[in-house]
Amino acid sequence: MKYMSVAEAAGKWGLTPRSVQIHCQRGNIPGVTMLGKSWQIPADAARPPRKPRAKGLPRSILEALKAEKRGCIPGGLYHRLQIDFTYNTNHIEGSRLTREQTRWIFETQTLGEIPGDVPVDDVVETANHFRCIDIVIETAGAALTERYVKNLHAQLKSGTTDSRKEWFEVGGYKRLDNVVGDMETCPAKDVPCAMAELLAWWKNAEKTFENLLDLHVRFEQIHPFQDGNGRVGRLILLKECLKHGITPFIIADDMRQFYYLGLQEWRQGSRSRLLDTCRAGQDVVIAGLKHFGHEALARQALAEQEKSEARKTSAQ
């Protein structure tokens, strides 16, 4: 009988030598023998079949979120994401609801004991944001279009006091020019063109972590809506992270100053602060993956972080 080496089998089957060695050790290749310290593999041996994936084991964070959402599983990754993402993104924009109050609204669909000085819009927009996250999870694979972005805004601002103002366009671009701090934003009349150009760029851009943040910075500079831009922008980040296998991140309220300063510095040509802040936000999600038993997804996320950092280093 003719035999081939591990290296020859690896080349023939399109596997790594290490994978072939593991198959030999596990007895997955009929007729294999050990000669000295080397495996001898029958030359006519067929490639061992791929080990079937364990049923129910999610291959991505998106799969895990979809499974938990559809199964109405309490106290898991989906549950935590809804509460933490919603609380922090709203708090960055000035919401007075506490995390505990946010949790109560999500879990019970009731107000509970909320002080009378909390604006009604804080409650309405919190409930709306839960729905926005559900939309993002269920439609993460969809193309990012102007219609998609406008729909997120419509969901977020539905039923708010803003929605009753004649000059406020719910689910539509701003009618009046606005500013963000000292930053001039895109004039209202130029928003449709600016958004079309931005989304066309993103459609053809390499889907890297850094390019995703560039999309976010440019979206915030356009500031296409009269209000709600930050929250819609962060929902877009969540959607595109889930779609393209990038670990999503939560900008915690205590990161707010670093986040805003990072946005400003990015526009001035310095990207490190925003990158570091958002990577810290990824660490929050990775910790959640570990806590809820998604160890494989946590390792996958850490490996993706390392690759992203390596690309950044090689580009410098």
Where are these regions (language model features)?
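FIC/Doc superfamily catalytic core
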Residues: M1-K12, P17-I29, M34, Q40-Q316
